[in-house]
Amino acid sequence: LGGSGGEIIFASDMVYVTRVEHFNAAHKLYNPNWSKEANEAAFGPCANENWHGHNYEIHVTVKGLPDPDSGFIIDVKKLSKIIKEHVLDKVDHKNLNMDVDFMRGQLASTENFVIGIWKELKPHINGGKLHQIRLYETPRIYVDYFGE
């Protein structure tokens, strides 16, 4: 592949660009097929019937070869707008169990949540390939998802 300055861009010149965003949301972990006692045993305080909240941090990584004209894989301003429109506007200051359509009918674990976020974002990423989503539930707990 040729670059604008005559340099050659090789397939091995894969670059990864990550955008970080923050949002707040509430949820509870509760399996309706289990007793209250079983839920409390499995999920502890996360099964609280009055919900609990997190200050989430999301890292969205796109991979690709730099465009020879712009040098970008994806314009990070556009990536931020995509994340806002297709994720943040749907989940920020919401109850994941009750208010978020793509979480309906499933346990609101961070693992299920990151898969749902992937499905919301993937169709809208152009100019690169969605590579990874890292979702921090707390500063010490996060999940990674690669779409596999």
What do the PLM-derived regions correspond to, one by one?
Residues 1-148:
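Charge-rich, low-complexity N-terminal segments
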